[in-house]
């Protein structure tokens, strides 16, 4: 489903390169590192393509970007604020400018799957941009986000 959608949308865009599917082991490793179970639609996306080397992050990039954010931003925020504004997100795509498309994880540890957000790193703010991954992908490749 996602692979076909992306292939259709990236026609003529040489910068997007769909990768091979992600292994279940790598998805599990990414979930363990991030500390939250991934929503089924994100797992389905990774099972079809492990990123696109531009917008969509691979499982390994999800880990490395989460690691970087956890290392960089604590110096700017108090512990509680860091937990709320940085650590409660599952980042899975990027705009290339340091901001991430993500799911929000609620205080009870459950993932909010009703929306996809953009996490703006300079302000530590989020804004809803899509209702699901398919809508986000469509908007991104049509230059609507």
Annotate each language-model stretch with its function.
Residues 98-101, 115, 138-139:
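Intrinsically disordered, low-complexity segments enriched in small/polar residues
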Residues 1-101, 144:
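A surface-exposed partner-binding patch
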Residues 102-130:
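Segments surrounding the PLD/"HKD" phosphodiesterase catalytic module and close analogs
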Residues 52-56, 60, 107-110, 119, ...:
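Generic alpha-helical propensity signal that fires on short helical segments
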Residues 125-135, 139-142:
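Compact, glycine/acidic-enriched structural inserts
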């Amino acid at each position: 489903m996602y692979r076909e959608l992306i292939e259709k949308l990236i026609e003529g865009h040489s910068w997007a390169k769909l990768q091979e599917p992600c292994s279940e082991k790598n998805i599990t490793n990414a979930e363990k590192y991030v500390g939250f179970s991934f929503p089924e639609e994100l797992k389905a996306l990774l099972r079809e393509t492990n990123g696109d080397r531009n917008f969509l992050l691979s499982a390994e990039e999800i880990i490395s970007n989460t690691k970087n954010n956890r290392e960089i931003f604590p110096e700017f925020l108090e512990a509680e604020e860091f937990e709320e504004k940085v650590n409660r997100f599952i980042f899975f795509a990027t705009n290339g400018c340091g901001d991430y498309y993500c799911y929000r994880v609620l205080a009870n540890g459950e993932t909010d799957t009703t929306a996809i957000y953009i996490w703006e790193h300079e302000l530590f703010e989020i804004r809803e941009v899509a209702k699901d991954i398919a809508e986000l992908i469509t908007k991104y490749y049509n230059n609507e986000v």
